[in-house]
């Protein structure tokens, strides 16, 4: 009996020790992580967990018994909630989600790095610039779309595309690559060139660029679908060039990379195009992953801003998903529809593009759709592909589920487990270099008590406010007289996000001065437009 009890206790002790060791291994090193020199944050727009799972099966080699891992499987560390500010409920749009990732602040749907009171809040890229780092964005949408705009600028509505484009003159970003020619007039481009930017409209010219600053506008709006130009690998090419250019700064860099069109394909409920966009994004991640291996001072964080489309791998109660159908498709349904409308004998071209021959009944349905024009035929082709692959969708909009977080490099363990999307921003901002302090001024001789009384009596409220702002500037900005990208006020949470003792002390002193009676000045107004007006096709 005693032996049995002793054995049980020993087994229990061994289990507890084993569990403790397992937890330690799971959580990683308990010592504080090292601070990276460079940060790359990559956003798969609309890339919910179903997309990464579907991509795994899409990439699976059917000739092997094993299902091969993808870059997403290798780098997975956690997940994140995505809800916006309470005024917008539980389901976010891209602008509010990007604001959370860029600033650590929840806001209303449609807002571009302004809070719910429409006041600008400082972004990761702005703070990096203030610390002497280089910054850049590479995207497959227009560069003034919701996600890149939230990292670069501020506006009460994501729909103010022209205003956002103009505001980029003040960002001082070193690299901006994507689409958006439509929103940059010749006059505006001339202003960028006057500020030293090389402005390109042909992606092939990127090879000749050897230094920042560069702005690439490679399409009227978004870049072409990856499925229609699979050899272009534009996001990988732009990302590699951005890394090359930004790494010229010894102070480090912060780069945003977005696979923008995953979301657009999801809104269209277009599984074939979505998987091609996932492949494009995965290729760009692998470019950065390789860079991280070669530059061990670089942190990579990958996530999504939200889920799009309610993608379902299998539907109608049938336990099947045929990825082989998708791998054979060599053009987007939009492109297939255009070609079918341009030809009298269209059936052969459709079969060739789909990689399979529709049945007579399916051809009859497509023919009826063709009679109604390109949009109806495109929808018919997408439904046919969904039926053949057994893919399901629940919406043409966004859903409110959590998204995955992937990371590699120094401090990547910070992103393990569950977190909110604002936590990702807080962690990234805390990893930026410490703000450069201004040189201390020589202390003045202390006046006598009578003189102090006179000074206290005559000091006005505006002077107290000026002292507070001067103190903030001297503690936060790189140079004593440097002008911040936006007005930085205590309610922006800039200081608490930095997690710097000196900065917190500066905030406390500034707030004490402000409490003497000075009122904060309001920030400059942003363009007026309905903040909730955003079409699904480009959310």
Task: Please describe what each predicted stretch is.
Residues 24-31:
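Cleaved targeting-peptide boundary
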Residues 446-469, 475-483, 487-489, 493, ...:
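Asparagine/serine/threonine-enriched low-complexity, disordered tracts
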Residues 89, 93-116:
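A glycine- and small-residue-enriched flexible loop/hinge segment at structural boundaries
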Residues 36-38, 47-53, 57-99, 145-444:
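A post-motif C-terminal structural segment
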Residues 34-39, 50-51, 56, 117-131:
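Active-site-adjacent structural elements in enzyme catalytic domains
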Residues 2-22:
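Gram-negative bacterial Sec-dependent N-terminal signal peptides
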Residues 476-479, 483-539:
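Long, low-complexity, intrinsically disordered segments
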Residues 106-166, 172, 180:
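Extracytoplasmic mature domains of secreted/periplasmic and thylakoid-lumen proteins
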């Amino acid at each position: 009996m005693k032996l049995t009890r002793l054995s049980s206790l020993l087994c229990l002790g061994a289990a507890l020790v084993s569990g403790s060791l397992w937890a330690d291994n799971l959580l990683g090193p308990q010592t504080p992580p090292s601070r990276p020199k460079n940060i790359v944050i990559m956003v798969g727009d609309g890339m919910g967990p179903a997309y990464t799972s579907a991509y795994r099966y899409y990439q699976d080699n059917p000739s092997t018994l094993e299902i091969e891992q993808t870059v997403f499987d290798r780098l997975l560390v956690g997940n994140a909630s995505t809800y916006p500010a309470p005024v917008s409920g539980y389901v976010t749009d891209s602008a509010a989600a990007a604001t959370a990732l860029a600033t650590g602040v929840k806001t209303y749907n449609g807002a571009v790095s302004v809070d719910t009171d429409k006041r600008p809040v400082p972004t990761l890229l702005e703070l990096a610039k203030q610390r002497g780092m280089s910054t850049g964005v590479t995207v497959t949408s227009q560069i003034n779309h919701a996600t890149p705009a939230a990292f670069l600028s501020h506006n009460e509505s994501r729909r103010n595309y022209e205003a956002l484009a103009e505001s980029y003159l003040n960002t001082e970003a070193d690299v901006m690559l994507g689409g958006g020619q439509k929103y940059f007039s010749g006059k505006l481009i001339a202003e960028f060139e006057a500020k030293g930017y090389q402005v390109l409209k042909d992606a092939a010219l990127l090879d000749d660029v050897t230094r920042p600053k560069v702005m690439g506008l490679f399409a009227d709006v978004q870049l072409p679908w990856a499925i229609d130009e699979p050899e272009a690998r534009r996001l990988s090419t732009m990302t590699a060039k951005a890394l090359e250019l930004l790494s010229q700064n010894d102070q480090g860099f912060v780069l945003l990379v977005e696979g923008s069109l995953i979301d657009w394909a999801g809104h269209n409920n277009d599984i074939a195009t979505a998987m091609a966009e996932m492949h494009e994004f995965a290729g760009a991640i692998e470019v950065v992953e390789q860079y991280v291996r070669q530059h061990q001072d670089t942190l990579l964080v990958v996530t999504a801003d939200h889920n799009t489309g309610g993608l379902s791998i299998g539907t109608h109660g049938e336990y099947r998903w045929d990825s082989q159908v998708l791998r054979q498709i060599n053009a987007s349904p939009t492109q297939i529809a255009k070609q079918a409308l341009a030809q009298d004998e269209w059936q052969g071209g459709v079969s060739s593009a789909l990689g399979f021959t529709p049945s007579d009944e399916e051809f009859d349905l497509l023919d009826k759709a063709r009679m109604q024009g390109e949009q109806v035929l495109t929808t018919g082709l997408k439904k046919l592909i969904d039926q053949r692959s057994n893919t399901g969708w629940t919406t043409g909009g966004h859903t409110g589920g959590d998204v995955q977080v992937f990371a590699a490099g120094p401090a990547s363990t910070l992103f393990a487990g569950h977190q909110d999307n604002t936590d990702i921003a807080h962690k990234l901002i805390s990893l930026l270099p410490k703000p450069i302090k201004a040189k201390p001024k020589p202390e003045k001789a202390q006046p006598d008590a009578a003189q102090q009384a006179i000074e206290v009596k005559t000091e006005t409220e505006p002077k107290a406010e000026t002292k507070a702002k001067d103190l903030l500037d001297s503690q936060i900005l790189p140079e004593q007289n440097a002008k911040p990208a936006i007005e930085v006020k205590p309610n922006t949470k800039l200081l608490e996000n930095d997690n710097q003792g000196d900065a917190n002390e500066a905030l406390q002193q500034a707030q004490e001065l402000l409490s003497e009676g000075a009122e904060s000045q309001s920030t400059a107004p942003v363009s007026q437009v309905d903040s909730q007006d955003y079409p699904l096709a480009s959310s």
